[in-house]
């Protein structure tokens, strides 16, 4: 990791940078912190006339602000900040899907749910007590994003969650691949950014598929449903290939586990025979839909199948994926490290983890200087550079 190589800014920071990774994102937070420390080493002295070298706390050995959320025996909790954050530009990082964390509830071991993580976030914000200059929340998997619209007498949990955060003083909310970005309409006067990791997916696929041919005759991008067409079109356009999609026929007369069951997947697109497939979606929950799509593509004689998803939840375990891999239904599964990854998942030979820590660090570095992040929201230039390297047989 080279020192002082990322970012040259013409503005002073909004405030002293402070990073608060909650326990759910401790490992990711450490990686983000390492990047920030490396980039800022020497930057203040090198550009003293712009940065003011003596700017308090600009260059530090760590930007992590120590915090904790201890619990009482009843399961109740409180947020604690262990150092001053007065005047700081705070970035709180959390993973609401990290079920590996536990706490004692009246003598019983209780795994933390998304609700628990969201409450802990609010506790930490409350502990800051309005003393920070600005509070930004980086929540890669947006809390309750799948409950973004109302069908009948239902609660709008995602909108309520966003409004709670802004009411507590949060100015910016950064998330990845929001299931429906229109939920930002709940907080139209506050910062809300949703980022797609298409660049990381393309880079990691090309690293692991040296024989892939990037043309319409040998590659297609597939959306497993109509809701994900936007991300599939974006990736297909950047790769210069065609896209196809499946739409789900559902039984609207039945409700199972809160949803109408899928009756069949119908395909719309060109012939897939002999072509490599990139299936891209926002999340793998149980994985049944993704595996069904892979099977249907294999039935149509597709070649290699790469399944990409920002969030690999694998709520029903890995057995179905293990079996499908043994049967040759797919080549690789790619998800990111912004949600909890089990040791079992990381050990699978078919699994590729896409690290987003540098991406998050870049966002924080720019926002702290109130600089534009447009180039990070649309990484088309970076994607084209990777594709050029791949075609020239250079190391990616």
Question: Model regions: which residues?
Answer:
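PRPP-associated nucleotide enzymes
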Residues: 1-396
């Amino acid at each position: 990791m080279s020192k002082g190589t990322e970012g040259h800014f013409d503005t002073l920071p909004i405030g002293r940078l402070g990073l608060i990774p909650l326990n759910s994102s401790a490992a990711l937070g450490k990686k983000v912190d390492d990047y920030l420390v490396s980039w800022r080493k020497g930057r203040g002295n090198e550009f003293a006339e712009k940065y003011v070298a003596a700017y308090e706390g600009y260059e530090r050995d760590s930007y992590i602000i120590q915090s904790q959320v201890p619990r009482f025996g009843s399961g109740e909790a409180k947020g604690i900040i262990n150092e001053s954050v007065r005047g700081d530009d705070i970035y709180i990082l959390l993973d609401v899907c990290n079920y590996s964390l536990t706490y004692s509830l009246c003598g019983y071991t209780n795994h933390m749910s998304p609700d628990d993580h969201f409450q802990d976030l609010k506790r930490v914000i409350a502990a800051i007590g309005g003393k920070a200059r600005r509070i930004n929340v980086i929540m890669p998997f947006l809390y309750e994003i799948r409950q973004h619209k109302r069908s009948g007498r239902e609660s709008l949990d995602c909108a309520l969650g966003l409004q709670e955060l802004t009411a507590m003083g949060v100015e910016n909310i950064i998330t990845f691949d929001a299931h429906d970005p229109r939920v930002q309409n709940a907080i139209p006067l506050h910062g809300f950014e949703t980022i797609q990791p298409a660049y990381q997916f393309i880079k990691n696929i090309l690293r692991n598929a040296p024989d892939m041919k990037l043309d319409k005759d040998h590659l297609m991008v597939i959306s497993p449903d109509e809701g994900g067409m936007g991300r599939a079109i974006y990736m297909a356009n950047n790769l210069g290939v065609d896209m196809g999609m499946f739409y789900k026929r559902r039984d609207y007369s039945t409700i199972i586990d809160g949803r109408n069951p899928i009756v069949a997947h119908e395909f719309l697109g060109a012939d897939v025979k002999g072509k490599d497939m990139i299936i891209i979606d926002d999340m793998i929950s149980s994985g049944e839909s993704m595996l069904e799509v892979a099977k249907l593509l294999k039935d149509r004689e597709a070649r290699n199948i790469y399944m990409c998803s920002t969030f690999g939840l694998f709520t029903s375990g890995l057995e179905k994926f293990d079996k499908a891999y043994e049967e040759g239904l797919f080549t690789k599964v790619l998800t990111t490290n912004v949600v909890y990854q089990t040791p079992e998942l990381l050990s699978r030979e078919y699994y590729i983890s896409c690290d987003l820590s540098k991406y998050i660090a870049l966002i924080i570095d720019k926002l702290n200087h109130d600089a534009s992040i447009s180039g990070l929201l649309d990484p088309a230039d970076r994607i084209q550079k990777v594709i050029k390297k791949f075609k020239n047989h250079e190391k990616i």
